[in-house]
């Protein structure tokens, strides 16, 4: 009788063990466990924003909007100098004829990680992808193919210089600090 119970237990254990064989372990990096949306809505304090920044790096970016729950992005930031205010430089991709220094976009399918940002802009007519390293960053912007394309770079309190294969600029912050940018298309 003990042998039958032992064999039945072994058979059931083997059957249950075989059921788990279809699952596989996904190798995840530590960055996959970070949720940049934690702590973004506060009813008592000023809200913070989901931030894209590597530890101890010079660049910090977050989607520029009035608050976390708004439906519009106010352009795409190039660099943010603190955790709750506007960016030092602003980039606005555009297709159309109404050019403004900063363009408000409706957006969808936003995806943030600590080192990248991806969003579809203006009713999915444009897609912006942003990746950063410690001292530089890369924007990739995909447009509709059949319309003229414009990219507007804005410096609120500074200047922009357009060269043959580069764009450079500086902006004066409120505490007499200069922020410089060098962009290659």
What are these regions (language model features)?
Residues 24-185:
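Accessory carbohydrate-recognition regions in carbohydrate-active enzymes
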Residues 17-18:
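C-terminal motif of bacterial Sec signal peptides marking the signal peptidase cleavage site
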Residues 2-9, 13:
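Sec-dependent signal peptide recognition
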